[in-house]
Amino acid sequence: ISYLLKSLKDFPVDITAVVSVCDDGSSTGRLREEFNTPAVGDIRKVIVSLSETEPLVEELLNYRFKTTSDLNGHAVGNLLLTAMANITGNMSDGIESLSKVLNLKGKVLPLTEDNVVLMAKMHDGTIVEGEHHITEAHSKIKEVYYKHKPIVCDAVIKAIREADCIILSMGSLFTSILPNLICKDVIK
């Protein structure tokens, strides 16, 4: 989605990106576990792609620490988003605040404020828990679903209803695209 948005921001359109928040690997997974927050990695990528700031800011937000401390592997942008969510009280407000600082050309919305867990039922009947385990599974996926039904953000429903055009972006069908579409509130 971030590559598409990087190009779309050059056109005279109002962009609203709805971002799946089920990533649970690497820096995002650790932050989700520690702060019980929605995934921030994909949100960071979308924010960077819509940002109207210097290339150095993009490099900073995507920078991952390489150290032997607990910061190892964390992306600066993921830490900033998590901090903003803590400061403002929720992820949506944290994204909005950081978006103003970074002069975004568009709006970024998390699908949900919930710390969701994506599940997959494989064709062989096994159940796989967690987005990064699903992408690493060697079996064919039959269906994906959430461990607990998420509450879709009201702003997401409003944005979908008011949209002139809805574009489904490139990405993994089962771990990036379908997680937004398996929510009944989104489909309605």
Which stretches of residues belong to each language-model region?
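Electropositive, gly/pro-rich neighborhoods at or near active sites that engage anionic ligands
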Residues: 22-139
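Short internal beta-strands
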Residues: 15-20, 188
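A short, Lys/Arg-enriched amphipathic alpha-helix followed by its capping loop at the start of a domain
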Residues: 3-14
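Active-site gating loop/helix substructures
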Residues: 114-170, 174
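Short glycine-rich anion-binding loops that position phosphate/pyrophosphate groups of nucleotides
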Residues: 1, 18, 171-175
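Charged helix-capping and loop-helix junction motifs
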Residues: 180-187
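Short N-terminal binding/cap micro-motifs at the start of the first secondary-structure element
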Residues: 1-5, 25-28
